[in-house]
Amino acid sequence: MQRAWILLTLGLMACVSAETRTELTSDKDMYLDNSSIEEASGVYPIDDDDYSSASGSGADEDIESPVLTTSQLIPRIPLTSAASPKVETMTLKTQSITPAQTESPEETDKEEVDISEAEEKLGPAIKSTDVYTEKHSDNLFKRTEVLAAVIAGGVIGFLFAIFLILLLVYRMRKKDEGSYDLGERKPSSAAYQKAPTKEFYA
């Protein structure tokens, strides 16, 4: 009866897998030569933009002026509970768009001076903000997750070593049981009799 159920289950699985395979395949997948060029493999649509433009043509290049951006750190208020001593900070950053043409070093120096003057005008509000960030220590063993993994590995290794030593001691005792005199009586000499040494010749 059990074999009948196993054969029935295998037959059903074969039917279901055969149906899914026929649904996934189509006539286009079976034949390599298709009737039209659009359906043939290796034919891609023609992109006219690739033929009309070349590298360095300069027709579509947009000259953008640089956008000055500043980044300001906004600290979040930390929770007072001992469960979460970490303070999360959020940094606002915007990306600057660089122009296609290079600028002279004098112009970039002027822009840096303008930025520093703008920061000074904002006053000590920006300078006095204390930002607390979580610093990952450079030493590998000062991290808590690494330290926990090392301790767990050491405990498991120590237990394995103790188990191995106990197994060796048990095997040694079992092996040595027959080699020492444990107070058992030795068989008497009458149990082992010598064969007669006389020889008879015919």
Curated annotation (Swiss-Prot):
Site (Cleavage of ectodomain): R143, T144
Biased composition (Acidic residues): 104-117
Key words, A-Z: Differentiation, Glycoprotein, Heparan sulfate, Membrane, Neurogenesis, Phosphoprotein, Proteoglycan, Signal, Transmembrane, Transmembrane helix
PROSITE patterns (UniProt xref): SYNDECAN
Transmembrane segments: 146-170
A single cellular component GO annotation: plasma membrane
Chain positions found as Phosphoserine: S116, S188
Pfam annotation, one family: Syndecan
Carbohydrate-modified residues: S41, S55, S57
Localization of this protein: Membrane
Cytoplasmic side: 171-202
MF terms (GO), sorted A to Z: identical protein binding; PDZ domain binding
Topological domain spans for side Extracellular: 19-145
Function recorded in the entry: Cell surface proteoglycan which regulates dendritic arbor morphogenesis.
Oligomer and partners: Interacts (via cytoplasmic domain) with SARM1. Forms a complex with SDCBP and PDCD6IP.
Protein name per the record: Syndecan-2
Organism: Mus musculus (Mouse)
Taxonomic lineage of the native organism: Eukaryota, Metazoa, Chordata, Craniata, Vertebrata
